[in-house]
Amino acid sequence: WIMGHMVNAIEQVDEFLNLGANAIEFDIDFGKDGIAQITHHGIPCDCGRKCTKKAIFTEYLDNIRQVTTPDDPKFREQLVLLALDLKPQRISSAKAYRAGEDVAKKLLDHYWQRGNSRARAYILLNIPLVEDYEFIRAFKDTLRNEGYESYNDKVGINFTGNEDLDKIRDVLEILGILKQVWQADGITSCFARGTERLKEALEKRDTPGYNYINKVYAWTLVRKSIMRRSLRLGVDGVMSNNPDRVIKVLKEKEFADKFRLATYNDNPWERFRG
C-alpha cells in the first residue's frame, strides 16, 4: 500500500492518485463539541508541504464516495484504502465518544449512504493515542445502534502515536478488537527516525498467534534510501508525500519481484504470507 500523505483538499485526491498512490490519508479536525468539521492538518506539518489545505468533511466524503464507486465518472480503480487521521487531541477527552459517534454517522450518511452507496474503499481509523480509545468504542456502538454493524468488516484500527506496542495491545483487548489492526511507525519527514520500534512491530506481526497487528507501515517517507530500508525490513505499506518516488523504488531490481501494488482484491486485514 502506498499511502498519499495529508491529502486534505478535494483537488489533491487526483493529484496523489496520479502520482501512484493506491491509498490516501486525510486529517479530520474537530470542533470543541466533538463534531468533525473539516479535513485539515494545520501548522506545523511536514517540511516542504503546505499545511493549510482543507475541505468541508462531508463534502470531502461525498467526493471520495464518487472516486471509489465503480461506474461513477470520477471512479479511480486504484484507490482502495482511506486512512482517516483523526485529531481528537484537539478536543477534551470527554468529547472523544461524541467524536466517534459523529464520524460514524457522517460516514453512514455521506460515504456508505446507509446501504445505498456502492463505494467500496476500506476505511482505516488512525487514532493518535491509546487514551482516545473511547472514539473507537463510540464508532462501533454507533454502527450497531444505527443497524449497520456489517460495515465493521470494512473498518480497521491503527494507533499512530508511536506508543508502547504492549500498551496498544492492552487497549485493543479492552475494546475486544482481535483483528483488522494496522500499526504505524514513523515521524514527520523533517526528522530522521530509527528502526527499533518498526522492527518490533514487524516481529509481532509475524509471530504465530499474535492477533493485534495485521499490517505495518512506515511514515512519512520522502527519501528513497529510507523507503528502501523500510522495504527491506518487510513493511506492508509506506506513507509518503511523494508516491511517485515509492513507485520508482518498487521497480528497482531488488524489489520488483518481491513487492507489488495492492489492489481491491487484496484484503487489508489479512497478513500477507509470501
Swiss-Prot record:
One of its GO terms (cellular component) is extracellular region. The keyword Lipid metabolism applies. GO terms for molecular function: lyase activity; metal ion binding; phosphoric diester hydrolase activity; toxin activity. Its EC number is 4.6.1.-. It comes from the Eukaryota. It catalyses: an N-(acyl)-sphingosylphosphocholine = an N-(acyl)-sphingosyl-1,3-cyclic phosphate + choline; an N-(acyl)-sphingosylphosphoethanolamine = an N-(acyl)-sphingosyl-1,3-cyclic phosphate + ethanolamine; a 1-acyl-sn-glycero-3-phosphocholine = a 1-acyl-sn-glycero-2,3-cyclic phosphate + choline; a 1-acyl-sn-glycero-3-phosphoethanolamine = a 1-acyl-sn-glycero-2,3-cyclic phosphate + ethanolamine. It is an enzyme of class 4 (lyase). Disulfide bonds join C45-C51, C47-C190. InterPro entries: PLC-like_Pdiesterase_TIM-brl (IPR017946). It is found in: Secreted. Its main location: secreted. The keyword Metal-binding applies. Dermonecrotic toxins cleave the phosphodiester linkage between the phosphate and headgroup of certain phospholipids (sphingolipid and lysolipid substrates), forming an alcohol (often choline) and a cyclic phosphate. This toxin acts on sphingomyelin (SM). It may also act on ceramide phosphoethanolamine (CPE), lysophosphatidylcholine (LPC) and lysophosphatidylethanolamine (LPE), but not on lysophosphatidylserine (LPS), and lysophosphatidylglycerol (LPG). It acts by transphosphatidylation, releasing exclusively cyclic phosphate products as second products. This is Dermonecrotic toxin SdSicTox-betaIIB1bvi. It comes from Sicarius cf. damarensis (strain GJB-2008) (Six-eyed sand spider).
